[in-house]
């Protein structure tokens, strides 16, 4: 996890003519784990755009709904090159409802945290090193290629 201090230090060193795009697709998961997880939407730089999605924590992946936050001139430039089709009305309503339903989001994040602990413990019992994650996925460190092939083949069968 990158601290707010490190993020600001980085952004302060980027020349203003260089565009910085920050993908915060997993922001809600990181923010649940630590209050120190940086919310880059609160940073105001003339060359920074922050992207967020409803696909992850809100569970609305099929709607292909997200948003960008940044200086007005950058958002206007993005609008000129965006796809012709805006999200449909159902997606817009679902996104609005998702933002208002804080209880659902909290339950989702709590459930993710609980299941993450169970998975980390299960992998530890199997002798597999799982790299801790604040999101809704885990990276596994396999000892060698044969171990990768073994799990790959067995998971395909299930």
Task: State the predicted function of each range.
Residues 2-6, 33-36, 62, 91, ...:
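Residues at alpha-helix caps and immediate loop-helix transition turns in enzyme cores, especially N-
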């Amino acid at each position: 996890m990158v601290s707010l201090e490190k993020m600001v230090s980085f952004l302060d060193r980027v020349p203003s003519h260089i565009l910085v795009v920050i993908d915060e697709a997993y922001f809600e998961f990181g923010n649940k784990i630590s209050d120190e997880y940086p919310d880059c939407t609160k940073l105001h730089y003339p060359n920074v755009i922050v992207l967020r999605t409803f696909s992850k924590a809100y569970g609305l992946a099929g709607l292909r709904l997200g948003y960008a936050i940044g200086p007005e001139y950058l958002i206007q430039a993005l609008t000129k090159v965006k796809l012709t089709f805006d999200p449909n009305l159902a997606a817009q309503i679902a996104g609005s409802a998702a933002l208002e339903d804080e209880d659902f989001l909290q339950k989702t994040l709590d459930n993710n945290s609980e299941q993450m602990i169970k998975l980390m413990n299960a992998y530890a019992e199997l002798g597999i090193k799982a790299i801790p994650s604040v999101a809704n996925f885990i990276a596994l460190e396999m000892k060698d290629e044969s171990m990768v092939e073994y799990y790959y083949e067995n998971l395909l069968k299930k």
